[in-house]
């Protein structure tokens, strides 16, 4: 998606360890106009998949998933929680997820009330690196007896193993901007 690639080139900041900082428009301050175009593009790519629910993980995927929902008849958006909360149901589906950026493992949870047999779920997230978050969410979908319709990613680090890991479990992966490499303080797209 050229619009997203242009935004990355213009506003993205490269940090040590191949970390692309896009907090000015994607995962801290949100460019809602861009998100709207992202929603339209995911609708185009997942047209006909009969999606009735969107699943993401807190926190950075929530904004994108909410906008994407508009293009799938305002279907519910569910997000997996990384932290225990007093108001969280005790009856949950759980999976372990390792964060590439934070180098930390989380036990993510979704209430059993929100993932059901017969659901056709689209996973949405801001980044795909090693695939750990998406694999954890796919595990939760399976625990609930629901069906994975596909995985929609804003930015994929194509030089990491995430896509291969997701394709191994049969996931349809659609990424809007695929980084081919980060070299000499420059981003290259596939």
From Swiss-Prot:
Supply the enzyme class, top level: transferase
What are the UniProt keywords, alphabetically? Cytoplasm, Glycosyltransferase, Purine salvage, Transferase
Q: Does the keyword Glycosyltransferase apply?
A: yes
Residues that coordinate or bind 5-phospho-alpha-D-ribose 1-diphosphate? 129-133
**Name of one Pfam family that matches:** Pribosyltran
For this UniProt entry, the molecular function terms from Gene Ontology, in alphabetical order, are: xanthine phosphoribosyltransferase activity
Q: Its pathway? A: Purine metabolism; XMP biosynthesis via salvage pathway; XMP from xanthine: step 1/1
Catalytic activity as recorded in UniProt: XMP + diphosphate = xanthine + 5-phospho-alpha-D-ribose 1-diphosphate
Q: Where in the cell is it found?
A: Cytoplasm
Which GO biological process annotations does it have? purine ribonucleoside salvage; xanthine metabolic process; XMP salvage
Q: What is its main location?
A: cytoplasm
Residue numbers binding xanthine: 20, 27, 157
Record-listed E.C. numbers:
2.4.2.22
HAMAP family cross-referenced by the UniProt entry: XPRTase (MF_01184)
Q: Function, please? A: Converts the preformed base xanthine, a product of nucleic acid breakdown, to xanthosine 5'-monophosphate (XMP), so it can be reused for RNA or DNA synthesis.
Q: Which family does it belong to?
A: Belongs to the purine/pyrimidine phosphoribosyltransferase family. Xpt subfamily.
Q: How does it assemble?
A: Homodimer.
For this entry, the protein name equals Xanthine phosphoribosyltransferase 2
């Amino acid at each position: 998606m050229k619009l997203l690639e242009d935004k990355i080139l213009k506003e993205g900041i490269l940090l040590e360890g191949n970390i692309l900082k896009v907090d000015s428009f994607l995962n801290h301050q949100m460019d809602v106009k861009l998100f709207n175009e992202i929603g339209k593009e995911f609708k185009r790519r997942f047209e006909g998949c009969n999606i009735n629910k969107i699943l993401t993980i807190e926190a950075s995927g929530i904004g994108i998933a909410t906008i994407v929902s508009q293009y799938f008849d305002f279907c519910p958006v569910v997000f997996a929680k990384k932290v225990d909360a007093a108001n969280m149901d005790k009856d949950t589906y759980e999976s372990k997820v390792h964060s590439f950026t934070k180098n930390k493992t989380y036990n993510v949870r979704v209430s059993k009330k929100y993932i059901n047999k017969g659901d056709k779920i689209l996973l949405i997230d801001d980044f795909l690196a090693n695939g750990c978050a998406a694999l954890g969410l796919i595990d939760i979908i399976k625990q609930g007896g629901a069906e994975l319709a596909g995985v929609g990613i804003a930015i994929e680090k194509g030089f990491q193993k995430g896509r291969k890991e997701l394709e191994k479990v049969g996931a349809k992966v659609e990424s809007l901007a695929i980084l081919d490499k980060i070299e000499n303080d420059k981003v290259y797209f596939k």
